[in-house]
Amino acid sequence: INGEWIKSESNELIDVINPATEEVIGQVTAGTKEDIDKAVSAALEAFSTFQQTTKEQRIELLNNIISEYENRYDDFVQIITKEMGAPIWLSEAAQAKTGIKNIHETLDALKDYEFERPEGDYTLIKEPIGVIGMITPWNWPMNQITTKVSAALAAGCTMVLKPSEISPYCAMLLAEVFDKAGVPNGVFNVVNGYGPTVGAALSEHPDVAMMSFTGSTRAGIAVAPVSYTHLTLPTTL
C-alpha cells in the first residue's frame, strides 16, 4: 500500500497450499475493510498526479516494467509453479510468458492510441476514470492481473488489486517489479484476503470509480449487485 509493505489490521493468516503436493508453502494475511480503506485512499491521492502524466511518460513506465519483469522472470515461474501446482514448463511457457506478453501488447496499443482527436465540430478527449478496483482468480493469475493492471497504467488510472487468496504470491512479486520499475507510490496497491470481506469492501467503496472482476460465478454474483448500487460505477465481469 502506497509503496510500502505494511502490517494489516488483521492477525488472521491464510495458508497458501501447493495443490500438487498439498504442502503449505507460506501464509498471507487476511486483509480487512480498514486495509482496503487505506489502499483506496493511497490510490486516490496518487491519482491526482498520475492522471496528469503524458502518454510518453507512461510508455517509458511500461518499458521499465517489462525490463524488470524480465529480470524476475524465473522467480515468476517458480512461484507460479508452487502456488498453482503447475509443471515448470507450463509456468514458463504459458503462465509467466502470458503476463509479459500482455504488457508488451498494452505498450504497443498505447503508442498508437489517441487520447484526444477531432470529431466534426468537437474534440473528443478520453480521460482516466480514477481508482479501479480489481479482483482476479487463482487459475491464470498473471494473465488476468497483467491484462487489467497494464491497461489501467496505460490509461493513467490508479488501482487496488485483490488477488485470489489461493495464489497471491505472483501479485506480490509483481508489486516488487513495479516498485523497482519506478511506478509511483500509491498507483498500484495489493490487499490480500477473502472475497466476502476484502472483495466486498473494495467493490462497495465510494472512492472506487470502476470495478474489474474475473472469477467464479458465486463471487461475480456477490460483486456485481454491490457495485451496481453505485449507479455511476462501471463494472466489467
Which role does the model predict for each range below?
Residues 232-236:
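A short, hydrophobic C-terminal helix/tail in secreted or cell-surface proteins
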Residues 115-231:
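Rossmann-like NAD(P) dinucleotide-binding subdomain of oxidoreductase/dehydrogenase enzymes
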